[in-house]
Design a protein with these regions (language model features):
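Beta-lactam-recognizing serine transpeptidase/beta-lactamase-like catalytic domain environment
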Residues: 1-39, 44-172
Length: 172
């Protein structure tokens, strides 16, 4: 700390102030920075839909390369489409269209409920300073295009710690 503060300033700090000063020097982006998770979200989309009975896990969905929501064509990674895919194949091929079809069956209220159950949009409570909460939609202000893109991890954000904690919950 002596690089940035005088001895007098350091001595005047309580432990919390010192922790904050150290944090500023060695900020932990895994805790403090949020990002759009992308494809790692897809497992949570499937898990919530199965848990709610919106899907059984045995469905086959057609991927034509895009789906239309509102004023938007939202594309899959496979621009020409994957063709018919099981849910497992949809996860393996990282198919955005399969996730959009699943979340359309689940609905925005249940999707948002499961984002919260898995810990997105809230601090984890990890014992490190500077934890961010991430940003998720409320069902009341989520339009169809936002629901579709959230299903494959875009248009919302979380921290790496939230994603790791979410996977811990998912695996259990």
């Amino acid at each position: 700390l002596s690089t940035y503060y005088t001895d007098e300033e350091i001595q005047a700090m309580d432990e919390k102030a010192k922790s904050e000063a150290w944090y500023k020097m060695w900020r932990n982006f895994c805790v403090s920075d949020s990002y759009e998770p992308g494809s790692p979200q897809k497992a949570f989309t499937v898990a919530g839909a199965i848990e709610e009975g919106a899907i059984s896990g045995n469905e086959v969905f057609e991927c034509g390369g895009k789906l239309h929501f509102g004023d938007w064509d939202i594309r899959c990674v496979a621009r020409a489409g994957h063709g018919p895919l099981t849910i497992t194949q949809g996860l393996m091929k990282s198919c955005n269209v399969v996730m959009m079809r699943i979340v359309s069956l689940e609905g925005k209220e249940k999707f948002v409920q499961y984002q919260k159950i898995f810990g997105f949009g809230e601090k984890t409570g990890i014992d490190l300073p500077g934890e961010a909460s991430g940003l998720i939609y409320q069902a009341s202000n989520m339009d169809p295009a936002s629901l579709a893109t959230n299903a494959f991890g875009q248009n919302y954000n979380c921290t790496m710690v939230q994603m790791a904690a979410g996977y811990g919950s998912l695996i259990n």
